[in-house]
A protein has these predicted regions:
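Bacterial N-terminal signal peptides
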Residues: 17-29
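Intrinsic low-complexity/disordered segments
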Residues: 13, 31-34
């Protein structure tokens, strides 16, 4: 179903459409050189079964948060670690991601400190947020959903994560572990995690829909493969 059809059917309101548009914008590919194209991963449904360690140097979590209803603040977290378990059995697939909240950046130092403050993340008390889950379900040939647990600001809630397996890299040197890439998206309401009480997001019915769009791009190296 296209975005136009969804909007025509009234399934999304303006705020949900804005969050979806943000996800589409952030997911747009950037220009690549011929050399970069040769390093693109190959597409497949899921990576080979085994355990994979997230490469924190090539993995990032992005967010787009509503600012006083009408504005939008974008930023990212630069320290993402964790593990991914792939299996031929979707019920056995798992993910364990840890994000260093203090690594967030919106490119405005004063705003970053505000977001790190007790009004929002309160990083001194809650230095990390996590996403953990086991079991996935297919929603299209290369799209999956995991109903994992997001723990943020000391509050844990089940949050569906939609993701795609982008593929396995083909230019890995002999002796080095296999490398795979994923892209995931989700959305949350900050009020449900006890954050942003001063933002007045109850206007226009904002509290009924996600006001923060989240994306995560991950590269991970195999640590174990089936024999």
């Amino acid at each position: 179903m296209t975005l136009k059809n969804i909007l025509n059917k009234g399934i999304l309101n303006r705020i949900e459409a804005a969050a979806l548009l943000l996800a589409l914008i952030l997911a747009l590919p950037v220009g690549t050189t011929h050399a970069q194209q040769s390093k693109r991963p190959t597409a497949s449904t899921l990576p080979p079964p085994g355990a994979y360690k997230i490469d924190s140097d090539h993995s990032f979590a992005y967010f787009g948060a509503r600012h006083h209803v009408f504005g939008l603040v974008r930023g990212r977290f630069d320290k993402v670690t964790g593990t991914i378990t792939s299996s031929n059995d979707p019920a056995a697939c798992a993910i364990d991601v840890v994000i260093d909240v203090a690594s967030l950046s919106t490119q405005i130092p004063e705003r970053d400190e505000d977001i790190r403050s007790p009004v929002y993340f309160d990083v001194k008390k809650f230095p990390t947020m996590t996403y953990r889950g086991r079991g996935i379900r297919r929603v299209s040939p290369n799209s999956w959903v995991m109903d994992g647990t997001l723990t943020m600001h000391g509050i844990a809630k089940t949050v569906p994560l939609s993701f795609n397996f982008n593929g396995a890299f083909t230019d890995i040197k002999p002796g080095n572990p296999a490398r795979v890439a994923f892209h995931g998206t989700t959305g949350v309401k900050r009020a449900e995690f006890g954050m942003g009480a001063r933002d007045n997001l109850d206007e226009l019915g904002m509290l009924t829909t996600p006001d923060v769009a989240i994306e995560i791009d991950v590269e991970a190296d195999a640590t174990s493969m089936p024999k």
